Design a protein with these regions (language model features):
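Hydrophobic alpha-helical segments
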Residues: 1-189
Length: 189
């Protein structure tokens, strides 16, 4: 894995430098999150990438049936499995400030420690296994997932989350996206 940006010629797009199509997407994103994340400024260089990301992300949030804390555990599991420090920091902030992830669970996730909450531990483990096995999780983990009270549709929504986070995680790898100040307190060392 490279520690330097592999995309060299494309630069972050600002509202001032955006084409009309890019501007509409970025403006919508700013209205949703209150600022222009560096990740979005990079993704919009290929407008279909940001558009697909925002659409899928919104559907996962609104339709997955996961509680907000569970959604964040899914996103953290994927981002960690993909080695994306930007998204791990960003979702750590959301987990801490907005989604109600218990502090001990967030600490365990960020530090690679066992998660004491069995439902969230099962969700985290299965999600990571889906990523690491390219969609072929261990049958025992799936059985534990059902036993924890999750349904088959939840597994499909994990696939959606993996798809969405792959767009963001891989874009961040290619650009070596600079962490936004908003997420600085959650930066991984």
């Amino acid at each position: 894995m490279s520690d330097s940006a592999l995309i060299q010629n494309l630069k972050p797009v600002t509202l001032a430098s955006a084409t009309p199509a890019q501007h509409d997407m970025l403006d919508k994103a700013v209205k949703q999150v209150g600022f222009l994340p560096n990740m979005y400024a990079n993704m919009v260089n290929a407008p279909a990438v940001l558009s697909t990301y925002l659409h899928g992300y919104g559907l996962f949030r609104s339709e997955s049936g996961f509680a907000p804390a569970e959604q964040e555990v899914v996103f953290l599991a994927i981002s960690q499995a993909n080695g994306c420090k930007y998204c791990t920091a960003a979702h750590s902030m959301v987990a801490d400030k907005m989604s109600g992830v218990p502090a001990d669970v967030l600490n365990s996730i960020r530090n690679g420690l066992p998660i004491e909450n069995s439902r969230l531990a099962t969700l985290f483990q299965l999600t990571q296994d889906v990523v690491k096995t390219h969609g072929k999780p261990c049958a025992n983990l799936v059985k534990a997932f059902w036993a924890a009270g999750f349904e088959e549709k939840h597994l499909l929504y994990i696939v959606l989350a993996v798809s969405v986070k792959t767009l963001s995680n891989y874009t961040n790898h290619l650009f070596q996206t600079q962490l936004d100040d908003v997420f600085a307190a959650y930066k991984l060392s």
